[in-house]
Design a protein with these regions (language model features):
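The feature encodes a structural signal of leucine-rich repeats
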Residues: 54-58, 73-79, 94-100, 115-121
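Conserved hydrophobic position(s) of the canonical leucine-rich repeat
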Residues: 41, 63, 73, 84, ...
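Conserved hydrophobic beta-strand positions in leucine-rich repeat
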Residues: 41-46, 66-68, 85-89, 106-110, ...
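N-terminal capping/linker segments that flank leucine-rich repeat
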Residues: 1-65, 80-82, 103, 122-124
Length: 129
């Protein structure tokens, strides 16, 4: 008898995982999603889903477009999502955000937050802010 273990990505926020289930990338609300189900996803629209923790977003390694507008986010680590082109973080709780690793970023919407500073000096492709 052999056991096959598949890589899983930890997603502790139930609202985040439920949104992934609703999109068909997961099927059980258990804090985990098969990494193979999400690592080639090109776009995520998670608008007004009451998400407050995006732990697990790093599993979406091929993500080009990400819309997280209207959630309860105050922190997100997008450093592993290196191919991101378009990001909408409007209407959250951000005071700061580090996008220095997202050098392919072309469009960023981040209005209606609590930003005190935003460093986009490394985002040389950024055309829309």
């Amino acid at each position: 008898m052999s056991s096959v273990f598949q890589d899983r990505t930890y997603i502790p926020d139930d609202n985040f995982e439920q949104a992934i289930i609703d999109l068909g990338f997961d099927d059980v609300l258990d804090d985990y999603v098969l990494t193979s189900n999400i690592n080639e996803v090109g776009g995520l629209g998670l608008i007004s889903k009451n998400i407050s923790d995006l732990t697990g977003i790093e599993g979406f390694r091929d993500l080009l477009n990400l819309d997280l507008s209207g959630n309860n986010l105050s922190f997100v680590d997008l450093s592993k999502n290196k191919v991101l082109r378009n990001v909408n973080l409007s209407g959250n709780q951000f005071k700061s955000i580090d996008l220095t690793k997202n050098i392919e970023l072309e469009s960023l919407k981040i209005d209606n937050n609590y930003l005190t500073e935003l460093d986009v000096s490394k985002n040389i492709e950024l055309a829309t802010l």
